[in-house]
């Protein structure tokens, strides 16, 4: 009977460790295959009525580069207000994914579908990305 409880304890410990590793291990939000399908990006910033559509492949690569790296953790750190949406479209105009960036008490949070992600560490690249899009859309271009 002692052996049974030892095995149960080991299985429970392994399950707890698996859940912990699932949330701590850095992941990417987009795969290379998904990136290859993206033909255009539409960006919308909260509080700005204009939407920006980008079709230049080099600019799309620059914008999506951070999302292709293992620099995010799963989970929702805090609540927050929607700051920006990045909609990814294929050549036929079908929406492939919606990435929502939320400013959560100074912490960046991203949502794709029903999954939440946040950067492994502070990343000024996302703040700069948001700022540049907001300035571009407020200028009307």
Q: Which positions does each model-derived feature cover?
A:
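Function-determining sites in protein domains
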Residues: 2-141
